[in-house]
């Protein structure tokens, strides 16, 4: 153990004090201050006179016993910070604890009379580290891991931590069975230093032996072995085993992965290793739901089968009813059906293939759409933070939208039918379009924010995605165009800037979106391929898709060929489960390739969060800052919009 010659301890002793007396003795505490804020905090957190004052009242003799216990506890704290000649004094109503009359004085008091407790410190000189020695053969690189310097303050936590660092360094250098004893420290009172010695038995460098895998139920062992980052014969490194453990957990099919080494090497001098694996449930059923004042209510169910073939592949099916409840930007109930099948490690490690099918029907102010979609994509993970994907998509859809104002343009873009019945809220004629779209999506993602799940609550990091999709529209109308979108979000923990006291509880978040559709005019682009703004994904406070070019005179959205949008959001947690946010969104949509040519719209608002195990439950209220009213538009922007869902807005 870490100690010096003589009788003193360096570890904080915790225990419960004896309690005597029937009536609690009320008291208040004044504790002296040192020049070290960390030491002050530790002293206050260790003193039971302070920490138990309200939660565990005591009688007069219990108070004396608690104070005597604090003498030893606080002395141990001071020594652990390097003050080995320090003293602690505690008085109760100016009487020292060894005063024989103290107990009688307290018992004769009225039960309502508060007692004054004072804690004072005499730190004495600060001890420093003297010699730092290692008993045993240790490689220079491992010895450097101690990170101790002669002359530095003799802080116990630093010395104990150095022993742990030395052990880890040896085990990461092939010494699987390295042993580092607790450091031994000897005081030199004359020079006010502690001389520290570490006793080490490193043993021999050893390779990995047999690697056993246990606990599998549905998964095939061959899948796990292909994923392993370590193999028999590799030099033993503790960090490599930990990396292999984390990699297996990241596959999403294991709930727990533990790694153990045998207590002794095998007859060949190797280190046998066991991966103890617990699989996640193979079947998962979930329900989803959301509400916004512009899109109404959506409700759905999803089902996932993990490891269909025992190789980590997954099949996911989902079905949702959307636009329930008459949102202000919708005109009827729709549906969204989808299925996805994903195969990990396709052809090579860290490369997956995903096949998807879907069906969608929705009726929006901008257009009515009925579509069947399909796609296949190959996702390649280049590193921990970089990934790329390439794929092929095919879509067959029918879209109904108001007719372009120019009749010749209307015919040129494939307006095959003039719909007799106008859309609710407008008397303008509408066109029916039939599209067959083939796309080649290419995507690159940089992610240090850890946003693997859409419900993740990011607190720091950056995520940037660039998507380029050449698209071919077959038949009539025919078109070729390329849609490019750059999206990004950044998260800054204000505690790192010294603007908050607790990590992860005060976060400043930013979101940005830019997009261009090149190669086709505004109306030759299929309506669902154009850009729109407004709603929770772009500019809160405005109806879904309502920002951008619009038909005259009814003001229904047309969509544009360029977009830019951005958000600044402050997130603050309160207590254990609650939080609030404030935000400002801004953006515009253009009918040309100049993303800045449209009218900038801004929205602002606030919301509350309730944090659950699945993610934060979100309720946001936003207002348009430059609200449009007649005669600028036929239909005014609503005074506010409400958004409810699971997960942060981004």
Residue ranges of predicted features:
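Periplasmic polypeptide-binding modules associated with outer-membrane biogenesis and secretion
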Residues: 22-38, 51-293, 297, 314-335, ...
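Hydrophobic alpha-helical scaffolding
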Residues: 153-156, 214, 231-235, 247, ...
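Extended beta-strand-rich architecture
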Residues: 272-280, 287-304, 381-382, 390-391, ...
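A short, conserved beta-to-alpha structural element at the edge of catalytic cores
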Residues: 136, 604-623
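Gram-negative/organellar outer-membrane beta-barrel architecture
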Residues: 139-141, 237-454, 462-465, 539-541, ...
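Short acidic, glycine/proline-rich loop/turn micro-motifs
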Residues: 146-147, 225, 402, 593-595, ...
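Bacterial N-terminal signal peptides that target proteins for export
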Residues: 1-9
């Amino acid at each position: 153990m870490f100690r010096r010659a003589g009788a003193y301890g360096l570890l904080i002793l915790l225990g419960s004090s004896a309690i005597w007396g029937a009536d609690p003795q009320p008291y208040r505490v004044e504790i002296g201050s040192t020049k070290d804020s960390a030491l002050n905090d530790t002293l206050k957190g260790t003193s039971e006179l302070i920490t138990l004052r309200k939660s565990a009242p005591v009688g007069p003799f219990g108070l004396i016993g608690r104070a005597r216990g604090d003498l030893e506890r606080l002395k141990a704290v001071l020594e652990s910070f390097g003050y080995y000649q320090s003293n602690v004094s505690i008085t109760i109503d100016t009487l020292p604890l060894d005063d024989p009359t103290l107990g009688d004085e307290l018992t004769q008091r009225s039960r309502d009379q508060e007692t004054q407790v004072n804690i004072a410190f005499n730190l004495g000189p600060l001890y420093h580290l003297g010699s730092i020695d290692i008993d045993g053969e240790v490689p220079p690189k491992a010895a450097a891991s101690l990170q101790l310097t002669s002359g530095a303050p003799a802080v116990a936590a630093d010395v104990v931590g150095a022993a742990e660092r030395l052990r880890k360094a040896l085990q990461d250098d092939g010494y699987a069975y390295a042993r580092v004893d607790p450091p031994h420290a000897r005081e030199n009172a004359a020079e006010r230093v502690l001389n520290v010695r570490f006793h080490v038995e490193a043993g021999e460098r050893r390779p990995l032996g047999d690697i056993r895998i246990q606990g599998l139920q549905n998964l095939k062992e061959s899948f796990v072995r292909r994923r392993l980052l370590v193999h028999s014969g590799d030099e033993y490194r503790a960090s490599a085993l930990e990396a292999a453990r984390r990699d297996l957990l990241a596959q999403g099919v294991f709930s727990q992965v533990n790694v153990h080494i045998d207590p002794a090497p095998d007859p060949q001098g190797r280190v046998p290793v066991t991966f103890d694996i617990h699989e996640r449930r193979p079947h998962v059923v979930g329900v989803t739901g959301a509400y916004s004042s512009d899109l109404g209510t959506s409700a759905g169910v999803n089902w996932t089968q993990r490891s269909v073939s025992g190789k980590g592949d997954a099949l996911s099916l989902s079905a949702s009813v959307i636009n329930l409840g008459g949102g202000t930007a919708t005109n009827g109930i729709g549906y969204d059906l989808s299925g996805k099948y994903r195969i990990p490690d396709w052809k090579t490690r860290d490369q997956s293939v995903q096949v998807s099918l879907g069906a969608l029907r929705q009726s929006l102010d901008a257009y009515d759409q009925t579509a069947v979609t399909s796609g296949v994509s190959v996702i390649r993970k280049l590193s921990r933070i970089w990934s790329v994907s390439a794929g092929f998509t095919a879509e067959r859809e029918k879209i109904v939208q108001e007719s372009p104002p120019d009749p010749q343009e209307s015919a040129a873009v494939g307006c095959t039918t003039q719909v007799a019945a106008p859309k609710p809220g407008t008397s303008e004629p509408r066109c029916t379009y039939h599209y067959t779209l083939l796309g080649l999506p290419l995507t690159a993602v940089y992610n240090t924010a850890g946003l693997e799940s859409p419900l993740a609550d990011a607190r720091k990091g950056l995520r940037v995605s660039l998507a380029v999709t050449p698209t071919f529209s077959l038949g009539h109308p025919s078109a070729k165009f390329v849609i490019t979108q750059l999206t990004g979000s950044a998260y800054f923990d204000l505690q790192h800037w010294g603007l908050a006291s607790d990590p992860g509880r005060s976060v400043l978040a930013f979101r940005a979106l830019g997009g261009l559709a090149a190669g086709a005019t505004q109306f030759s682009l299929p309506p669902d391929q154009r850009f729109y703004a407004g709603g929770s994904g772009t500019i809160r406070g405005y109806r879904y898709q309502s920002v951008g070019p619009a038909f005259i005179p009814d003001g229904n959205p047309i969509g544009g060929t360029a977009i830019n949008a951005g958000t600044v959001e402050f997130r603050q947690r309160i207590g254990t489960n609650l939080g609030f946010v404030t935000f400002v969104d801004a953006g515009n949509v253009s009918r040309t390739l100049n993303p800045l040519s449209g009218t900038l719209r801004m929205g602002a608002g606030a919301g509350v969060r309730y944090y659950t195990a699945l993610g934060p439950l979100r309720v946001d209220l936003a207002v348009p800052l430059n609200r449009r009213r007649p005669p600028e538009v036929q239909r005014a922007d609503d005074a506010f919009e409400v958004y409810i869902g699971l997960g942060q807005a981004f």
